[in-house]
Each structure stands twice: as C-alpha cells, then as structure tokens.
Amino acid sequence: MTILNHTLGFPRVGLRRELKKAQESYWAGNSTREELLAVGRELRARHWDQQKQAGIDLLPVGDFAWYDHVLTTSLLLGNVPQRHQNNDGSVDIDTLFRIGRGRAPTGEPAAAAEMTKWFNTNYHYMVPEFVKGQQFKLTWTQLLEEVDEALALGHKVKPVLLGPITYLWLGKVKGEQFDRLSLLNDILPVYQQVLAELAKRGIEWVQIDEPALVLELPQAWLNAYKPAYDALQGQVKLLLTTYFEGVTPNLDTITALPVQGLHVDLVHGKDDVAELHKRLPSDWLLSAGLINGRNVWRADLTEKYAQIKDIVGKRDLWVASSCSLLHSPIDLSVETRLDAEVKSWFAFALQKCHELALLRDALNSGDTAALAEWSAPIQARRHSTRVHNPAVEKRLAAITAQDSQRANVYEVRAEAQRARFKLPAWPTTTIGSFPQTTEIRTLRLDFKKGNLDANNYRTGIAEHIKQAIVEQERLGLDVLVHGEAERNDMVEYFGEHLDGFVFTQNGWVQSYGSRCVKPPIVIGDVSRPAPITVEWAKYAQSLTDKPVKGMLTGPVTILCWSFPREDVSRETIAKQIALALRDEVADLEAAGIGIIQIDEPALREGLPLRRSDWDAYLQWGVEAFRINAAVAKDDTQIHTHMCYCEFNDIMDSIAALDADVITIETSRSDMELLESFEEFDYPNEIGPGVYDIHSPNVPSVEWIEALLKKAAKRIPAERLWVNPDCGLKTRGWPETRAALANMVQAAQNLRRG
C-alpha cells in the first residue's frame, strides 16, 4: 500500500499577482479576452509544474477560477441570474464577470450577486441564486477544458468539483420562497454528465468537495446525501472531501455513502485517526489533511508522522493539505527581507507541498531523519524571546470586568454626544477609506523603497488628507474621515505599528475576484510601542469644524485577517491586541477626536462552524471589543462597522458590543439585514449601507431614498445614519463623488420630508 500525496487546490493569483493584473487590465479595456485567457493558461501550467517539482503525486485541476470557484460551479450548472443572461442564452467569461462585479466589457450592467465569506475563512464566494422551477444544464465547460490541458501536459490529475449538496447549501432563494434542497434532483443530471465526461478522459479519482458535512446540518440535508451519491456513483472513484472542521458528528451519514474515499481536515478538526480508521469501510481510502492549508507556519512533521503512523499499511492512505492552499501565500523563497530565524518558522504553499513529499517518503520508508531536521526550527521557536513578552502577559492577566465597561449606559452617552456634535437628522458619513489613487500608491511605494524621504512623504500624505476633507465638505457630508491615504490595508497598517507582527513582501492571498490581501503574521505577544493613528487624525480635524472620525481596526478583525500564532489561543491574541488599541483610543480622545470608529467586520466570520461552539467565541470576541472601547468618555461616540454579515443569530452579541453607532453592509441584501435589528429591538444607532461599493455602478437618489424609507419602517428614523456599505478604497473618484452626492441629496430630501 504505497502512500501518495496530493493538495486540495493551489493559489490561483500567481506569485506576482499576475491574474489580478490581467483581470483588471481586461476589465479596463486595456487587453483582449485572448490575452486574459493566455495568462490563465500560463498560470495553470506553471502551478501544476511547481507542485509536481515539489513532489506532489496527484495534481488538482478545477481549483483555478476566473473570479471564484462557487461562481464557476454556478456557470457549469447553467445557473445564471436572469439579469445577467446574454440575449442569445450563451454564457461566456463576461457573463461570469457581470455576476461577480455587476459589469463586464460586454453585456448590460446589472446588480452584482451577493458575496459572502467562504465558511470561516477570509475568502469570499459569489452566492448562487435559486428561483422556483429553475432549469439546469451543463453550460460552462471550463473544468473539462482544464483537465484536457493538464492531461496534454502529461500530468497525473485529480479533478476538483464542488459537491451538489454544499453548492445548494451555499446559495439563496430569490423571489418566491421554496426549499432550495428540492433542486437537488434537477442538478444531479449535470453532475452525472460531468463525471461521465471525466471518465471518458480516463480520470480515476475526482475530488468532490462537500465541506457542508462538517456543519451541524438540518436532518433533511443530511438525509439528502445518500440518494444524491447513489445517483453519482460508478463512473469514477469519488474522494468525498471535507475541511475546516472534523467529520465525526456526521460520520454515520458519511460511511453510508457509495464513495471510495474520504478526506478529513486533521488540523482544524478534532477527529481521532484511530476512530476514523475503525469506522470507515475497510476498502475506503483515507486522505489525511495533515498540513495546514490556512496558515503559514512550518509543520512539526515529527508530530504529523506520529499522528498517522499507526494506520500505515492497514488501509489505503494519502497525505494532503487540510484544505485548498488557496488560503496560503505561494512561495516563501522569494521573501528576502524576513529575518532568517523568523523565516525558518514559516512554510507557504510550495513549502507545504515539500512537507507533503517529506511526510509521504517517511511514511513509505519508515525513515524519519528528514522530518526531524525539517521540524527543528519550529521546535526551537517555543523558547524564543521574540515570541514571549512578560509585560504583555502580566497586563493581560490583570484584566478585570471593569476594564470592559463604559462609564455609563448608552442612553446617558447618547445625550452627551447629541449635545457635543449637534448633528442633523439622517446624518451622513462614510466608512473610512477614500479612493487609493495611483498617486497615493506611488507615494507610499516610493517611501517604502527609500526613493522618497520622510518629510516629502508626509507632505504628500497631508495633501491627500486635505483633498479628502475638501471633497467631503464640498459634498456636504456631516461626519468626515481623513481618507486613510497613509494606509495600505486596514489590518496590515496596524500590524506594522504593533510589536508581535511580521510582514511579507509577496505573501498575497486572494480575498475575492481580483482583490488580494497580504495578511500580517502574528509571531509573538502583541503590544503598541507608540501612537499609530493620532497624528493624521489630529491633522485632519484641524482642517475642518465638522467632526472627523478616528479610524481603528478592531482586535477580532486584526486577529481574523492575520495569520495567527498556533501556540496560544485566539482569545489570548485578540485580548492582547485589544489592550494595545485601548491605549490608542485614549490617545485619540486626548487629541480632541470625538468620534472613534472601531471596525469589526470580521466578528461574525470568526464564528466556529459548529453552533455549539459559538458562545465561547462570542464571549471573548465581545469582551475584546469592549476592552478596546471602554476607556472612552461618555461624549466620545464609538462607532463600529461590519460587513458581509448575517446578524440575526448573533444579535445579543452585537448589542453587547455596546457601540454607540453600528454601520452595516445591507445594500446587496436590499435591507433584509435590518430585519434582525428590528426583531431584536436593537437600542443604539444604525447606519445601514445604502449602496454597494464593490460595484462601480452609481446609485440614483431615488434608489437610495427608497432604501432609507425601507430602513425607517424597521428602525426609528432618529436612530438612522446614512452611509455607503463599506470603505471606498477600491473605487475611483468620479463614481465616488457621484455616488456620495446622490447619497447626501437623498438624506437632505428626507430631512425636508
């Protein structure tokens, strides 16, 4: 029984973000479709070759996507919303981009599909839309074309397909309500057709992703698995693939399925290998997800070997990444600025492939010398002084309940804030960032590269902040922001100014579409050596009589959008960050900043996948926010912002944050999200986002007014704010001005009644 290795997927964007650049060039009309397609082909060929060279036996095909793999699956099944369909019924790459972005080089613009987080990761998928009586047919053959590509290059391949039940679970019903699970029998024939096509190509194994099987699914959904997989069996071997959690609670459902193998995430799940071996059918292959696909840490391969060695030779076994390597940067070897000791603690996607090769070889041979050598740096890290800061650990241990309480309740604070700010009804504001123009990015880059001295850099940033204030005053906004010209990314910027973080040059991971992020890495205890945002906030406030918001990223979001340590709990990291940012709130307040926004867009996405684990997470997540904010005086207004959220199941915790104002992303869901605030009788102020900043389309005054009137039916108008869905960093100035002018006009119309 020779053990093989494989990955569940590989990063798509390219080491230098080639895919992003090609997408954006095509969208802007600066390159042709053929040029875009050529970049995709080149990246796929390179990535297959890199994995093969690193020692991977079975290469994933179908993990590449032009925007998102769930959207690719929608097109595969012919699930194209009516508003995005071509007149002749055809589907092309522009159809895909219109669903993702709301517009493309061809076709009519229309509202983009809703976007939400992929399970509990920082990747976003485009939510499939389902309507009653919908028809499905094999429409978009990208998967088959890419399999042909890989076979022509001589690779041993394993196609990757999002499973039918997870696909339905991830979608939403539009229009007349019905049970979307009822569509299962309509999509299964398309899956059968795809599997038949793969069988014709001589494919032995297909990785069929059903991560929904790690959730606490309703019984009806669990019951659907057996008939669905009965219909899919027989043409190729199916590797039922799960990740992000363990499968033990649903193992009875899984073991009844007519599949030939199971992949389990042995990093994030609590599954016991011996129990899995005992309960799985003896002729099933077990794919052991031993290498963390979601983090950047080098694995202790001696531990991984010990975890799996007892079942070697007792059943067919593969070793794999825990999930797709999509969530990891590509290659550590190009990081030239990382300190050698710190660099020795990391492994990116290609290094993780190498780890899988080392592990496979050791399991096949019994020789573990190479594993011990590889694991030495990560074992040495446990005692490094760069990891432990006794002062931080002491301060954390001394936290009391009082540290997470504002001095007075919201009603008392609101009165003090009204007296201080005297804002009109329907106050208008933005979420924080303004367009990051080429000039701003060039300025930061030149400074970073040493081509610009500190004085000239600061003069340049000050000029952009001044421009942002002038623009906002001209537009008539009520509460201003400084525009964040000095910030590259809302998490990276804070990480750069906090001890305990390190940064990469090329550690990019895909967030959605062409958007990539370069998450900081938490390597040790977190503290704040000096004020971070105070100087620029103070400068912006000096330019205007209107209030300017101080802008902070909250502790849970910094945690969730960074690569965390693996040697302490997430709670510990979040509270260390909260204490550091608490000092920032106090310093902003002392500098005369009266409104401070602490963004927590990631609070909900950090939820454990199983509801039974939620309470513990929410308790420390809320406490971290409150530790951060509680130092503020009564007449300092604390705002928070959240996006891509379903709130109804965590409203108690949202209210427990005790923010004076919460701004939320609601435009794509047509204000549906406000229902949960209404039902809960949310007591504080709310700014429901009135237009979707992820789309370049400019909303009309009438559209915004209609949304606000809809909002006022759910929330008393005196507690409503008017704002976009999210920051405006990725937009251009022309559409930003136009959209904000319409937003301000809508608010003024409502004030006049």
Curated annotation (Swiss-Prot):
Enzyme class: transferase
UniProt cofactor(s): Zn(2+)
Gene Ontology biological process: methionine biosynthetic process; methylation
A matching Pfam family: Meth_synt_2
Residues at which Zn(2+) binds: 641, 643, 665, 726
Residue numbers binding 5-methyltetrahydropteroyltri-L-glutamate: 17-20, 117, 515-516, 561, 605
Keywords: Amino-acid biosynthesis, Metal-binding, Methionine biosynthesis, Methyltransferase, Repeat, Transferase, Zinc
InterPro entries, A to Z: Cbl-indep_Met_Synth_N, Cobalamin-indep_Met_synthase, Met_Synth_C/arc, UROD/MetE-like_sf
Entry coiled-coil feature ranges: none
GO molecular function: 5-methyltetrahydropteroyltriglutamate-homocysteine S-methyltransferase activity; zinc ion binding
Active site: 694 (proton donor)
Binding-site residues, L-methionine: 431-433, 484, 599
Binding residue positions for L-homocysteine: 431-433, 484, 599
Record's cofactor remark: Binds 1 zinc ion per subunit.
EC assignment: 2.1.1.14
Reactions accelerated catalytically: 5-methyltetrahydropteroyltri-L-glutamate + L-homocysteine = tetrahydropteroyltri-L-glutamate + L-methionine
Family: Belongs to the vitamin-B12 independent methionine synthase family.
Its biological purpose: Catalyzes the transfer of a methyl group from 5-methyltetrahydrofolate to homocysteine resulting in methionine formation.
The name this protein goes by in its record: 5-methyltetrahydropteroyltriglutamate--homocysteine methyltransferase
Organism: Escherichia coli O45:K1 (strain S88 / ExPEC)
This protein's encoding gene: metE
